[in-house]
């Protein structure tokens, strides 16, 4: 096994901009590598929003190694099967013993968590490691010449490395590009629903919640996903439909009547769940163009998470990939023997992470295409592939659900961030020292 939590003999000062999942993951991993970490977060209090989160083996193996609080694992739901339904309810494909199969193949579980539970566990771990937090501080400008951030309040922070973990609407990205760079709509939006078991009286629906499984319903231009969280005490549903939010509006309260109308005629189980909804929000799904580089020329700014590779939720890899980013970056920085090796470490990070992150983004768009086919010849051909698995029991070759596709699942779930770093360092060891050369980028950026 790769050596974990390798500590560098040199201690970098690192500023992480953003205390979402990617920021906290990076703060933990870099702190475990022996560096001094300060997080700047615009929110005055860390109240993570969101609902369910599917944490796949490529991330759970990292989280286990970070020794997060036991209560996180106690709050998880581990699905025993994955079922794909035609929107009418007819089963197209299923994998039973999913939990056992996943653990056997990847030596780490597939868990469904509440986003708040994961976020609070990461925050607690970061504080335990001595990470400093400046809450209510919005980074406004970055002086790359001085390696310094300035917040709207006037507070300044100097660091050897600034990590852009400020999400989809990244201010760091605008500073790096020296221009406003808003995210782009994908044409889809999400309705997010969480139901409490205590509010469900229907015996069949209660059974679904109490016995964790993962269900997908796929239909023309839309699909739904449902799974248990909080150890079977809550049920998370996400509905993906064409975007009808106005330009410039990223989220707003939704109409329950409108939401239910979009799924009229779908599986009665799904519509019975939707009849229990008392309030819902609509979230515009956004993406970004690829950056030319995730590291600036001065090697004092690096991107992680949604700031560089936001992902549609169709493979549930946004959070998982962000955790990978943090783990790889932190472990690489643990290999440094001197500060002048920082540029090499960051180049290696980009080599290990950029192509994979951008490839996952492309796979999410392919999954949307496979799940959202309108009725017709292509949909019928897709369903025949699904049915062949249901009848034969074994998936071979390309498969419309990448969650169980033998070509995609091992690539996604089999990824070992720490081993990737160890293999890369073995192939290209860190030299005794390296001069920080290269072209200078912009000195100060204030959009």
Model-derived features: where do they sit?
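Accessory recognition modules or surfaces
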Residues: 2-15, 46-58
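C-terminal helical "tail/cap" subdomain of flavin- and related membrane-associated enzymes
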Residues: 2-11, 74, 81, 89-91, ...
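Residues at the starts of beta-strands that form the adenosine-phosphate
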Residues: 13, 36, 234
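Conserved mid-domain beta->alpha element of the FAD-binding
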Residues: 16-36, 40-43, 163-164, 226, ...
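Short phosphate-binding/catalytic loops that engage adenosine nucleotides
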Residues: 35, 68, 131
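Active-site-adjacent segment of FAD-dependent monooxygenases/related oxidoreductases
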Residues: 51-125, 371
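Conserved FAD-binding catalytic core of PHBH/FMO-like flavoproteins
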Residues: 88-91, 120-278
């Amino acid at each position: 096994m790769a050596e974990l939590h390798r500590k560098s003999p040199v201690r970098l000062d690192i500023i992480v901009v953003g205390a979402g999942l990617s920021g906290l993951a990076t703060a933990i991993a870099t702190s475990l590598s022996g560096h001094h970490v300060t997080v700047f977060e615009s929110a005055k209090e860390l109240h993570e929003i969101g609902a369910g989160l599917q944490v796949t083996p490529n991330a759970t193996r990292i989280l286990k190694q970070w020794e997060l609080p036991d209560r996180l694992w106690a709050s998880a739901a581990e699905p025993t099967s994955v079922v794909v339904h035609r929107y009418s309810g007819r089963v197209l494909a299923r994998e039973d013993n999913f939990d056992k199969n996943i653990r056997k193949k990847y030596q780490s579980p597939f868990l469904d968590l509440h986003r708040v539970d994961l976020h609070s566990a990461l925050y607690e771990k970061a504080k335990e490691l001595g990470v400093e937090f400046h809450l209510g501080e919005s980074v406004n400008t970055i002086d790359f010449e001085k390696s310094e951030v300035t917040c709207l309040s006037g507070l300044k922070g100097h660091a050897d490395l600034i990590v852009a973990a400020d999400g989809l609407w990244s201010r760091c990205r605008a500073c790096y590009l020296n221009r406003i760079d808003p995210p782009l709509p994908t044409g889809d939006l999400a309705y997010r629903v969480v139901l409490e078991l205590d509010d469900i009286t229907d015996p069949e629906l209660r059974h679904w919640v109490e016995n964790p499984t993962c269900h997908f319903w796929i239909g023309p231009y839309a699909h739904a996903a449902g799974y248990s969280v909080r150890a079977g005490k809550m049920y998370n549903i996400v509905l993906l439909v064409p975007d009808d939010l106005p330009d410039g509006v990223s989220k707003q309260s939704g109409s329950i009547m409108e939401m239910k109308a979009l799924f009229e005629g779908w599986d009665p189980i799904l519509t019975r769940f939707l009849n229990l909804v008392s309030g819902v929000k609509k979230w515009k799904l956004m993406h970004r163009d690829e950056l030319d580089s995730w590291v600036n020329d001065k090697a004092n700014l690096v991107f992680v998470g949604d700031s560089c590779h936001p992902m549609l939720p169709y493979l549930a890899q946004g959070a998982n990939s962000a955790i990978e980013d943090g783990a790889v970056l932190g472990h690489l920085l643990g290999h440094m023997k001197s500060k002048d090796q920082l540029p090499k470490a960051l180049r290696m990070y980009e080599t290990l992470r950029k192509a994979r992150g951008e490839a996952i983004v492309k796979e999410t768009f392919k999954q949307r295409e496979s799940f959202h086919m309108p009725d017709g010849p292509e949909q019928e051909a897709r369903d025949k592939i699904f049915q062949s698995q249901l009848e034969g029991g074994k998936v071979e070759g390309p498969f419309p659900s990448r969650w169980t596709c033998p070509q995609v699942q091992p690539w996604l779930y089999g990824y070992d961030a720490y081993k990737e770093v160890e293999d890369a360092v073995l192939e290209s060891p860190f030299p005794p020292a390296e001069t920080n050369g290269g072209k200078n980028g912009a000195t100060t950026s204030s959009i």
